[in-house]
Amino acid sequence: MNNIILIGMPGSGKSTLGVVLAKKIGYKFIDSDLLIQEREGMTLERIIEKYGDKGFIQVENDVNLSINPEHTVIATGGSAVYGREAMEHFKDIGTVVYLELPPEELEVRLGSLRERGVVSNGKTTVEEIYADRVELYKKYADITINEEGNQLRDTVEKLYDIIINKDSYN
């Protein structure tokens, strides 16, 4: 299936970039965090408070497993990579793109981790959360886009060029 699945840390621009990219290539757009909130009837922050990190990861994995569109850009939550089954599903239904950004830039973009509804797995800083996840992002990525110092439009153009040059998207 010709979907594009965006993974990366909170604040890496998955949702913002996803909407712009979907418009540019004529695809639909899904934000999996919004699907999770809709299913649970509460914010991500509240879901984490209620179920803890492990419970949230299970909810996220279940919701992500249920996503099965065609010609869609899917922005995942930053913790989606903790759900092995869902990540394998995403690899089956599309191309997984890791939006890579160093912790220093992420910290500037993020603000409060708690208010953002970020699964921390006991980690307290952006650097610690990044270190906990970076190998999983690399493991599941078909394409890695380094966003360091780039504007949104630059990243969209770079990803667009990669996508239109892939045989499966022609």
Task: Describe these PLM feature segments.
Residues 15:
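Walker A/P-loop
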Residues 20, 24, 134-170:
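NTP-dependent small-molecule kinase module
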Residues 6:
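Hydrophobic anchor at the beta1->P-loop junction of P-loop NTPases
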Residues 93-135:
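A glycine- and Lys/Arg-enriched "phosphate-lid" helix/loop adjacent to the NTP-binding pocket
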Residues 34-80, 84-89:
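ATP-dependent small-molecule kinase phosphotransfer cores
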Residues 9:
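P-loop (Walker A) phosphate-binding loop of NTP-binding proteins
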Residues 12:
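ATP-binding Walker
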Residues 23-32, 42:
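Post-Walker A helix-loop "phosphate-sensing" segment adjacent to the P-loop in P-loop NTPases
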